[in-house]
């Protein structure tokens, strides 16, 4: 049995196309009408949904706003079993570049970052992972999933994009034979304002070090600005979210 599940509290982006897809695939919507508190909402919603599922039920989770069902899902279970794993993550497109993406999220395998926007697995193992993800201090679900790859040997990444394909904003070619396809969302001011404080926690020491070096090297007339930047960085270190960089 294969079920497709998403988490969406409203209709936005590609949501209507996902629900009213061309292949008659029923998509279970979690979280509808609720207030969004953060990425952990998805893990909590999925865990609650999984409680009534049989261990061997196969659940496909997709992003509600960016995902398209590209073809029939009739062979998905067979394709998944051929991967010889219990949980399969989609491959991240590394929009921010390989080094920055790896620095923030870590890698699931030696070469690939798993993407939390699309993944699938058996209900038993997904329940185990969602419980762990919720208990982790980090507020970012993708970071948590990649860290869990180091804990469990039953997780793999769809390295060849056979079931899942994530396109990046710079991809000119968007044709694929994958079953589930994710297209980049609009990088508007709201998304940037959310992303900067979430991911700046991985770079604040780098920024502070650069400010200190520039304060020592550049002319006096530029130092007030650099000093201000350094003070802002220190303020961030003290008060801002560092849930993913401090071990609990």
Where in this protein do the model-derived segments appear?
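N-terminal anchoring/stem segment of glycosyltransferases
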Residues: 1-58, 210-247
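Acidic, Ser/Thr-rich intrinsically disordered and amphipathic helical segments
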Residues: 14-17, 45, 75, 125-128, ...
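A generic structural motif
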Residues: 27-36, 89-93, 157-163
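Short coil/turn segments at beta-strand junctions that form active-site/ligand-binding loops
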Residues: 55-58, 85, 153
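Short beta-strand-to-loop acidic/aromatic patch adjacent to the donor-nucleotide binding site
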Residues: 57-65
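A conserved hydrophobic position in a structured secondary element of the catalytic/binding core
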Residues: 64, 71, 121
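Conserved donor-nucleotide/metal-binding helix-loop-beta segment in metal-dependent transferases, i.e.
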Residues: 67-108
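Catalytic core and acceptor-binding pocket of nucleotide-sugar-dependent glycosyltransferases
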Residues: 111-207
């Amino acid at each position: 049995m294969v079920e497709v599940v998403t988490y969406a509290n409203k209709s936005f982006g590609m949501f209507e196309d996902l629900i009213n897809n061309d292949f008659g695939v029923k998509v279970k919507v979690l979280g509808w009408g609720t207030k969004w508190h953060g990425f952990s909402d998805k893990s909590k919603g999925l865990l609650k949904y999984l409680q009534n599922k049989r261990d061997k039920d196969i659940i496909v989770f997709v992003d509600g706003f960016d995902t398209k069902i590209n073809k029939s899902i009739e062979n998905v279970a067979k394709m998944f079993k051929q991967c010889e794993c219990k949980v399969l993550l989609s491959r991240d497109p590394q929009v921010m570049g390989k080094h920055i993406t790896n620095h923030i999220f870590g890698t699931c395998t030696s070469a690939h970052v798993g993407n939390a926007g699309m993944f699938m697995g058996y209900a038993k193992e997904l329940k185990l992972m969602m419980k762990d993800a919720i208990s982790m201090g980090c507020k970012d679900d993708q970071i948590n999933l990649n860290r869990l790859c180091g804990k469990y040997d039953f997780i793999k990444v769809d390295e060849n994009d056979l079931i899942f394909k994530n396109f990046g904003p710079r991809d000119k070619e968007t044709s694929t034979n994958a079953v589930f396809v994710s297209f980049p969302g609009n990088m508007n001011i709201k998304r940037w304002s959310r992303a900067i404080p979430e991911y700046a926690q991985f770079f604040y020491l780098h920024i502070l070090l650069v400010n200190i070096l520039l304060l020592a090297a550049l002319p006096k007339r530029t130092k007030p600005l650099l000093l201000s930047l350094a003070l802002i960085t220190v303020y961030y270190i003290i008060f801002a979210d560092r849930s993913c960089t401090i071990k609990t």
